[in-house]
Each structure stands twice: as structure tokens, then as C-alpha cells.
Amino acid sequence: MLSQYDEQLAAGDNNGFNKQGNATLYSFDFVDADDFLDSISGALPNNGHNNVNPNTNDISFEDMNIMNPNIYSPVSAASGDDFTQSSGQPMISEGSNYTGQNFTDYLSDNSLEGYDKNTSRPLHEVDIGFSNKRSNSTSTGSLSHNEEITPISHYSVDSIVTSPEPPINKQGDFPPIKRTTTVSSTNSITNTTKKPAKVTKPKSKDKNSHNMIEKKYRTNINTKILALRDAVPALRIAAGCDDVSIADLEGLTPASKLNKASVLTKATEYIKHLESKNFILKQQNIELHRLIQHANMNPKSLPPPPQQMQAPPQPGFGFYPPQNQSFNVTPASQYPSPQQQVSPTQQQTVHHPPQPNRYLLGGMAAVMGTSLFGGSGENDFRSLSALPFSYLFPNAILNPSPLTIQLWTLTKVLLVVGSLASIFIPMYKQAQLKKEDKPNTIPETSLLDWILISIGFKTPAKLSVSKRDAIISNLQGGNDWSQLVSDYFYLAGCEINFENCFLSLVLGTIIRHRFPVVATILNHYLSMKEALLLNLDYKGFSKSLIRLNQLISKVDGVSIFESTNLTTRLTNVFTNNRINANIVDGQNHVKYIEFYQRNINDYYAIVFNWRLLEFIHELNVTYLEQLNDDQSQVLTDLKIIEAFFGEQDNKLFGYYQLFTSILNANYAPYLFESLKDKVESSLEKFRIAYEGIDLTDHEIHNTSSEDEYEQESPVVYKYEPTLKSQKSLISSLNLVNEEEFIILTCSLTIYYYKNKEYDRALKLLNYLRLDNDSKTLSLLTFTSLITLINELIPGKIEDNVNLDSAIRICRDWLENPDLTQYMDEDIKLELKKIVVTKGMIVNGIDVNESDEE
């Protein structure tokens, strides 16, 4: 049976969805879905109404530690009763409270990741991405945790506009989930408890084989520990080696014991010591390279070599510390820091040779300069006739002509200019040498440089990695507007590529948002940058920039810089304000905080994820606007952005799954499998974080170097508690929030209702015990509720208390102006009509079809 969404999908993509008319729906176990909804029903705030067990009447959960689902990264303080196994032995001592690190820290622990990849049991493999028919491209939709695959790594134009097919029961692709028989397992456990335990002595052969494996395992570990001990000087001294002395420790203390803990501790200490020593040597090497480059650039100004001084002894094996120096001194104190190292050019005073005749030339220039103002040049020749040898001078000098007088005046002027030049030119050269001696710094592009680059009189500069990091660091909480404006002009004068244009547009958009006065001037330059950005390809290796480049060039265009909410959030991050301050859009704001914290070291990933969340929000509003109309455009847009929701990003893909399950209830089984796997994996990691990793006989055997396998004793597996028995723990850790629970329940109910399994749909609907407070509902949650009442009313299960509560909550939500101020009045009016009409039907009031429409 196809829903209205399947028909729209078929209309939108004939090649991919026309074959679904005769296909059966994806089949999965209803008992699993029922048990899972029962175990996560604590996600709703009114837990007193949620503890409903349809199968048994003697089970109640009165002491559930319900956390607020709207709090990000909750810390559980569950009591020891929440961790009790069926055997009656609590995992945590009774009466104690868990006060360890946050549960999110447990999930990010390296040891847990290693365990999850190697030793934990595999999760259920469910094809989440769904098979698509694509031309010239191949795509796989299986749920994968491979960190190296990105949604753009196999990107093509065809693959980006394909849509996931609704989940159908294809033989081989979607095998039905096996039904778990909880009754038989319960009976077997009951029988074992009634009969007395029979103690049997194991066979000697099996016991000997097991002991041999353990012995080889211990021998292998001890051998590696001994090899590690011989590699650390502090341990070799404690072991009594003769080739190592106290001086070889380089300031480290020798070990007092040789147990395994001491070996690992001293080995870690020695590794850190070597890293510190390596860092200091690198700094010295960099300083020497700098001095060599400076000497090659200025060979004439190189000062004489400094006086030879005794070099400090280099640490190493055979090095004895100076007198009165403790061995506990860290090796870093034995080396001068880069700030303390003074280059020879700074130690030597620059001595310039004296400038003889400088004052003499200055006096001559002054005398000749004053003679220029003494009258005409004839006075300089009149005194020549008084000389006793005046008869030797020609008549042209004694009685000069006007031309001779002019030539003499010009000669005096040139002599004065030459004298002044001989004074000031050496002073200028000396000032230039002082500038060259200063360390070279990267000059920042000023406003004048930007103007020169704009008119083509200067070549653009290249954006260095350090400058780029400084710009991004200022964007993430710098709160320095003057630096932000300076960075904008700097980027405007840099070479043109995708990253520079994107950063320049981000800076310009934030400035325009903060200072609307300059918007008129900035819009011209920003429009030019936007036109360039659309035609630029990113050729680097940053995955976030690759995805941003594909998103802008294929889907979003320059609309990303026109988003007011995105610009406001980026401005809030820059000014160290709350991320969602001054924003009311009906979204789950916790999602934005989660993605910011997960990508705090990648600014481009933050912008990318936030923009995808806005895509879902915009499609959500469009879906509500066309709730009873043709929704093919919404599904087409959802197909376009599908490729960007990579499965390696579980958070982002999970949010995409929630919205997809609302649009098409046939995706509800995949959402159920995804949430169930997440809960089971989180519970397993939580158990491992508390109990530690248990090594089985098989793991012990695999770690040994034995090549031949011997007969082993059968492995006895530990009892794994069911999800039902861990209901309180699930709610305490907030593994499933209120939004996920409501959407999953609504989607599964619609799924069974459209499959004409009304009893099962009604049974799942009973878990939807909603709170009367509508202020905590996000837009996505409201969409799932209004879709539920729109699909089930009128129908065979319309007479239900939970449906009546959903109608009341939807009506209150629409009448709250604080929650719907971003919506058009026409959309709100149409939604109110739908809710009122459904409420009248539930209350038994006859409604004509024309009125209902």
C-alpha cells in the first residue's frame, strides 16, 4: 500500500519510483519496535504517564531519573538500582551515585573507540541510504562508520539530484529482522533458577589447554615488558645494568621498582622527556638557519665572530650535570630559550668608520652658500686685480663677461649641493642598514595597498597559513571589530581563490549586519565577490571546503550570505554571545550548539552544518504550507540536498532521517533501527567505561604467538540485560530526547496504520503520552504531530485520548506568538483550520467534506 508521499515520489521520478506500486513494505519485528518504544518512553517529560507496559501489569518504573531533554550533554546521576542485572548483583554499589565524567566524554574516549572497532559486537547493518538508480555514478547507502568517506568523495551531478527510494521489501537487500522470543529465554532462566546448580569437574584436557593459553599470553606480555624496560635508562639502572650511570638519566629520577606499572610509568616519562628535548633542538636548529640566511643576505654587515665561549655540555648518555645541580632538573632548563638566545649581530655594537672632512665640507658649503647672496658675480673678480701676479690672469677673468659670471654662479650652486649631499647621503644609508637589521615581519595590506591593487598598480598578496588561522581565530570569539575590518581589507588585497573569497564574504556580511550604514557601499564589492565565488573551484584538501564549494556551486549559490539567521549566529560567535541569541525560528537550538562543539576546530564545517540545518527548516515550513497540496517540490528539494548528509556524520544524518520519516512514514523502520543501534551502542560503551573491557579466551589466544590451535573450553557469555530492564538508565542518560521519541512514535504509528494493521498502530499510539506544555516543542516535533492527526483523522482509531492531546497541543502551539512569529499569517490560519477540523471530528461533530477542505 502506497501513501500519498509515494505517489508524489513516483510523479517526481518515474525511473526510480514507478516500480513501487506492487512492492511490499519493509518488514520488521513489531515486538522489537514495541519493546524499544517502551524502553525509551522516559524521554517524555511526564514520566508518570509513560510507564505503560502493554504486556505485563506488575512492572512499574517509579524512580526514573528523567533528565530535561532540552539540556545539551546531560550528566547522569543514576542510583545503583538502575544498573541491576537479572542475577540480582548491581553493577554499582547500592546507594552510591555515579559522579564520574560526562557520558559524552565516555563516548569520545579513545579506548572506547578502539573497543568499538575491534572487540564489540557488530551493530545491525541496515541500508539507511537506500538504493538509487543512478547514471554514470555509483552510490552505496549502507550505514557506515568509515571516517575517510565523505559525501563529496563520489560526487557527481547525477548523484546529487537523486532521491532515496521508499523502503520496500526487496529480497536480499532488506532481510526481515528476526523475531526475538523473550518467553523462551525467560522460561529457560526460570528453570535454571529452580534447579540446584550441579557442580561438575571440567576435563583435565580442557583445563590444561586453557592454562597453556594463559601461560603463553602472560609470557608474551612479560617479554614485551622486559624489552621496554631495557629501552629506558631509568629502568636499566634499577635492573642493575653496568653500562648506564646516573648521568645518563639527563635529570630523570631512577625507578624504585620494576613492576609493570613502574615500567609503563617510567616509559611514558622518558617519552615526554625525549619530546621536550626534541622540541628544544628544533628551536635551536631554526635559530641557526635564520642566522645563516641573515648572513647570506647581508655578507658585508656581518660582524666579526664573537669571542669563543665554552659551550654548555650537551645532554646525552655520559653527560654529568654541573656541580651543585640536582639530577631532578628538567632538561628544558639546561638550554636557553629562543627569547634568551641573542644573535651575534645583536651582541656586537655596530662601529662605523669616522667621517673625515664632514664638518669641513659643511663649513665650505656654508661659506659658498652665503656668497651666493652677496650680490652679482662681478664682485668675486674685482679683488683679483690687487694681486701682485694679476698680470698673469687673462683679461676675460679680470674683466669677466656676463656669460662668465653666470657660469661661475652655477659652479658655486653645484658645490653647495654636493657638500650637502656628502652630509645627508651617509646618514640615509645608515638608517637603511638599521631597518635591514630588524627581524622581517609580514607586512599587512593597508587601505592604500588595497586601492593600488584594485586599480592594478600592485600585485595581490598570498594569504599565508598563519594569517588565515589568525583571521579564523578572530571570527571564533575575537570580538575585535577593528581587526575584523583590517582583515577584510587584507583579504580584499589577496589573490583570488575560493577560500579567500569565502572568508572575505563572511567578514563583509558580518560587518554589513553590524553596521547597516555601510551596507550601501559594501553591497557593491560583496556582489562582485559573490559573482567570483560562483565560478571558483576549490583545489585544496580540506573536506569542509570541498563540501562548501559543492554546496554553493550546485545548490545554494550566494543565498548562504543572504540568510539572516546564519549571519546572526556567526556574529554571536564572533562577539562571544549566545549562539542562538536574538533568533526565534522554531528550530531545536540545541542542534546548533552540538554542531558547534563537535566542529569547534573547523570553522568551515560549522558554517556547512548550520546551513544544512537551515535547509531542513526551510523545507519544513514549505511542507506545512503545502500539507494538503502537492508536495512534489519539497521532495525534489530534499533529493537535491540528500548527498550532503553524509552517513559518516551520524548527528547530521540522524536529523535528516527524522525529517524524512515525517515526510514519508515508510522510512520509519530505518529510523527505528538507527535509534536502536545508537541506544545499544551507547549502553555498551557506558558499561565498558564502568566495568572495563573483558578479555575472553579467544582474545587471549589471538594475542599469543601460538600458530597451532588446540582444543579450548567452551566460552560462557555473560548475560546481557534487555532494553526494557535498562529503561531507567536510558532515560537518565538521555540517549533519546523528546523530539526523537515523538517523531519515531508518530512515524511508526502512521506506518502501521497505512499498512492496515490498526491494532498495532493503536498499541504504539498509546506510548504518545504528551505533556500539556507546548512551549518545549520544536517546529520539527510540531510537524510530526500535525502529520499524525492529519493522517489518522478521520479513521478507525480516531477515538483516542492521545490524538485529542496532540490536537490540543498543536492548537496551543499555533496560538503562541513567540513560537510562530517567523511564519506567515496565511500559513498559520490554514494550519489552525486543519487542527480545528480534526478536533471537531474527534469530538463527534459532523464536518462536510467541503468544510474540511
Swiss-Prot record:
Recorded name of the encoding gene: CPH2
Phenotype of gene-disrupted mutants: Impairs expression of hypha-specific transcripts and leads to a medium-specific impairment in hyphal development.
Top-level taxon of origin: Eukaryota
Compositional bias annotation for Pro residues: 301-315
Role: Transcription factor that positively controls filamentous growth, virulence, and invasiveness. Binds directly to the two SRE-1-like elements upstream of TEC1 and thus positively regulates expression of this important hyphal growth regulator. Functions independently of known signaling cascades involving EFG1. Also regulates gene expression during intestinal colonization but is not involved in host cell adhesion.
Descriptive protein name: Transcription factor CPH2
Annotated compartments: Nucleus
Upper lineage: Eukaryota, Fungi, Dikarya, Ascomycota, Saccharomycotina
Listed Low complexity bias regions: 180-194, 330-352
GO CC annotations on file: chromatin; membrane; nucleus
Residue runs in coiled coils: none
